Design a protein with these regions (language model features):
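Short secondary-structure boundary/capping elements
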Residues: 60, 108, 257-260
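Aromatic pocket-lining residues of Rossmann-like dinucleotide-binding sites
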Residues: 140
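Glycine-rich, often acidic-flanked micro-motifs
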Residues: 2-15, 114, 118-128, 143-305
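Conserved lysine of the Walker
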Residues: 133
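Short Pro/Gly-enriched beta-strand edge/turn motifs at strand-loop
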Residues: 52, 95-99, 200
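Post-Walker A alpha-helix
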Residues: 136-137
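Long, basic/Gly/Ser/Thr-rich N-terminal segments
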Residues: 1-85, 291-305
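Extreme N-terminal, non-catalytic leader segments
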Residues: 62-122
Length: 305
C-alpha cells in the first residue's frame, strides 16, 4: 500500500517491507492476567492498551477497539476490529502506534515525532502526545515544504549520518489545528471511533516527500506553552535520555533490545545535532517559529528571533 494500510504491503523504508492484514471484526477473547506483560491506562484509569505474548508473536489489544498481532520478526501485522467498531480505528492505531512498534521489533530505530523536508534535508520534531509536533510540522506546508512523516520517524544509518525515511502519507490533527492549517479541499479519512483527531491524506496542500532525506537536526519540543522562542543545544546524557523516552520499543523487557537501542541512540547523538526547542503555543507565532528553524538549519550559531 502507498497511503492506506490494507490487506497489502505497506512501505516501511528501503530495507523493510511491513505487511498489514486487516481482517473482519471479531470478538475480543479474554486474555489471562498472567499473560499480560504490560498495560497502559487511559485518562480515566481504564485499560487503554494491553500487551501479551501469543506464542512467538505479540498481541496488542485496545479494549473494545481492536486487536493487533505482531509477528516474531516484526514484518507482519494482523488486525481485527472489535465488533461494532470501524476499520478506520484499526488504521489510525496502526499508523500512530502499531507500525512503529513493529518496526522496532524488526530492528529499526523509530522516534515518536514528525519530520519535514527543508531544502534537501530533514528535520524532526519530537514531543509527547499533544506536545505540538504534528501541528508544527504541518505548519511548514504553509510555506511550500513537504512533510516526510507524522507520528513515527524511522531513521536509517548511512555513511554520511542518519536518513529520515518516508512513511504513510497522512497526518492526524486535533480540531483546533485543523481549523488553522487544513484547506477546505483536503482529503480526509473516515472518522475513527476512539478519537476526535481527524486523519488527512496526502495530496493538495499536504505534499509528502517520498524519498529518504539526510537528517540535519532533531528538535525536542519543550512542554511550556508560554515559553519564549529559544533553541538550546543538547549533548551527551542531556540528549540521550529524552531520545530514549521518545523511542518506540515493543520488546522493552529484552536486555539485548535495550542495549541495541542505546547503541543506536548513542550513534545518533554523536552524528546528529540535537536541540531543545521552546516556543509559545500560538498559531500567530508559528510563522516566526518556522523562520527561526529555517535560519537555524542554515546557521546554527545564529540566535532565534
Amino acid at each position: 500500500m502507498a497511503d492506506e494500510p490494507s490487506q497489502s504491503s505497506a512501505p516501511a523504508g528501503p530495507t523493510t517491507l511491513l505487511e498489514l492484514k486487516l481482517h473482519s471484526a471479531r470478538e475480543q477473547r479474554p486474555v489471562p492476567d498472567s499473560a499480560v506483560i504490560h498495560q497502559t491506562l487511559a485518562a480515566d484509569g481504564s485499560p487503554w492498551m494491553l500487551i501479551s505474548k501469543d506464542g512467538p508473536a505479540t498481541l496488542i489489544r485496545y479494549p473494545d477497539l481492536a486487536d493487533f498481532l505482531i509477528s516474531a520478526d516484526g514484518l507482519e501485522v494482523d488486525a481485527w476490529p472489535a465488533p461494532d467498531n470501524v476499520p478506520e480505528s484499526c488504521k489510525q492505531l496502526f499508523i500512530s502506534q502499531i507500525r512503529s512498534l513493529a518496526l522496532s521489533r524488526a530492528g529499526h530505530l523509530v522516534l515518536h515525532g514528525s519530520a519535514v523536508e527543508l531544502g534537501e534535508v530533514a528535520v524532526a520534531f519530537l514531543a509527547n502526545s499533544g506536545g505540538g509536533k504534528s501541528t508544527l510540522a504541518t505548519s511548514f506546508t504553509k510555506d511550500g515544504h513537504r512533510l516526510i512523516v507524522d507520528d513515527g520517524v524511522q531513521l536509517e544509518s548511512s555513511p554520511e549520518g542518519y536518513l529520515a525515511l518516508p512513511g504513510i502519507a497522512s497526518l492526524r490533527l486535533w480540531e483546533d489545528s485543523e481549523a488553522e492549517l487544513v484547506a477546505a479541499d483536503s482529503q480526509v479519512a473516515p472518522a475513527a471511533g476512539y478519537t476526535s483527531k481527524r486523519r488527512f491524506l496526502g495530496g493538495g496542500s499536504f505534499v509528502f516527500c517520498d524519498q529518504p532525506r539526510p537528517l540535519a537536526r532533531i528538535y525536542l519540543l519543550g512542554d511550556d506553552p508560554e515559553a519564549a522562542l529559544s533553541i538550546v543545544p543538547l549533548a551527551g546524557h542531556a540528549a540521550l535520555l529524552p531520545l530514549l523516552e521518545h523511542t518506540f520499543t515493543l520488546d522493552f523487557d529484552d536486555r539485548d533490545v535495550r542495549a541495541r537501542n542505546l547503541r543506536m541512540l548513542a550513534q545518533l547523538v554523536t552524528n546528529t545535532p540535537i536541540y531543545r526547542l521552546d516556543f509559545p503555543r500560538s498559531y500567530a507565532e508559528l510563522p516566526d517559529v518556522r523562520e527561526a528553524i529555517r535560519q537555524h538549519v542554515l546557521d546554527p550559531t545564529r540566535p532565534p528571533g
